[in-house]
């Protein structure tokens, strides 16, 4: 469940499993490494180590429902003939899938726009980057099909030269930014104002994976509207405990044998958090 949000599932972030309490993200900084050769050993640069901490936060899902309402409907036979009913298996499967989907959606939102002070959330990447003076900030606006090319251009122009061209560099965009970009490509971005866009097919086409100025555009469903982040996926980290806790352990407990009640409980426990290593290698576009 935890790993089925689109940022994680599509490889937009590096997953660090088996983090029991915390994990240190080591950062190394050096100066110019190469110097003229001599007979003696002389350090050609200093090495500075700093760190950021990945500390997963514990979360839980606790739900309870009564089996009695199912007796009167078409699922009654699937509950068995005993007075100690069981939850209809089809509904139990649906309930597990429903919980897994809701958790995945919430985690996707937390990855980008979570706030640690809010129940059920941890600080997301936007909150962390906003508080970090080393992050490259770009002041944004409301993104539309008419201005999306210029706004994406501002982000790409702000990407550090050493980062541009990196294999895993992405432009993480909110859904509305992606829709605006696709509409622009279908209408006027490539072939001139009023033209039929990429391939001459207007908006009647599937563009598939798109790029901007050589950088892949990654739709991050958890990003709030009008936000854009440029970063390497290898610089963004999602930390959790055992992957089995995160992905498979949605438990359905029938309470009949435990307390004699007609209740069923749905339980899930997991840990999660995000962080990044290098703030100076992240560009954050924030709408004004």
Describe each PLM feature range.
Residues 75, 110-116, 166-174, 193-196:
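Short coil/turn segments at secondary-structure boundaries
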Residues 67, 129, 175-177, 270:
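Short, flexible loop/turn elements at secondary-structure junctions
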Residues 74-158, 285-288:
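Alpha-helical scaffold segments that mediate packing/assembly in large oligomeric complexes
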Residues 1-32, 123, 127-142, 146, ...:
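Sequence/fold signature of self-assembling virion shell proteins
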Residues 150-188:
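Ordered core of a single globular domain
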Residues 2-77:
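Assembly/oligomerization interface modules of large self-assembling protein complexes
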Residues 100, 104, 108, 175, ...:
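Internal mixed-charge
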């Amino acid at each position: 469940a935890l790993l089925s949000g689109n940022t994680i599932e599509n490889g937009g972030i590096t997953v660090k499993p088996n983090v029991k309490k915390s994990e240190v993200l080591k950062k190394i900084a050096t100066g110019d490494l190469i110097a003229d050769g001599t007979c003696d050993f002389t350090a050609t640069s200093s090495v500075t180590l700093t760190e950021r901490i990945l500390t997963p936060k514990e979360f839980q899902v606790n739900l309870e429902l009564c089996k009695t309402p199912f007796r009167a409907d078409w699922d009654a036979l699937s509950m068995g003939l005993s007075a100690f009913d069981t939850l209809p298996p089809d509904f139990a499967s649906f309930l597990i899938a429903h919980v897994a989907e809701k958790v995945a959606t919430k985690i996707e939102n937390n990855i980008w726009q979570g706030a640690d002070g809010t129940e059920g959330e941890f600080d997301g990447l936007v909150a962390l980057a906003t508080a970090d003076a080393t992050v490259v900030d770009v002041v944004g606006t409301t993104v539309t099909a008419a201005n999306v090319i210029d706004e994406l251009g501002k982000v790409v122009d702000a990407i550090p030269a050493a980062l541009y061209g990196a294999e895993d560099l992405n432009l993480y965009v909110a859904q509305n930014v992606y829709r605006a970009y696709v509409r622009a490509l279908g209408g006027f971005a490539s072939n001139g104002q009023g033209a039929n866009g990429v391939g001459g097919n207007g908006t009647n086409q599937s563009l598939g994976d798109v790029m901007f100025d050589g950088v892949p555009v990654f739709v991050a469903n958890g990003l709030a509207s009008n936000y854009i982040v440029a970063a390497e996926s290898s610089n963004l980290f999602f930390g959790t405990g055992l992957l089995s806790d995160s992905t498979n352990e949605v438990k359905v407990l029938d309470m009949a044998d435990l307390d004699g009640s007609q209740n069923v409980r749905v339980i899930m426990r997991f840990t999660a958090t995000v962080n990044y290593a290098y703030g100076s290698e992240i560009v954050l576009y924030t709408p004004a």
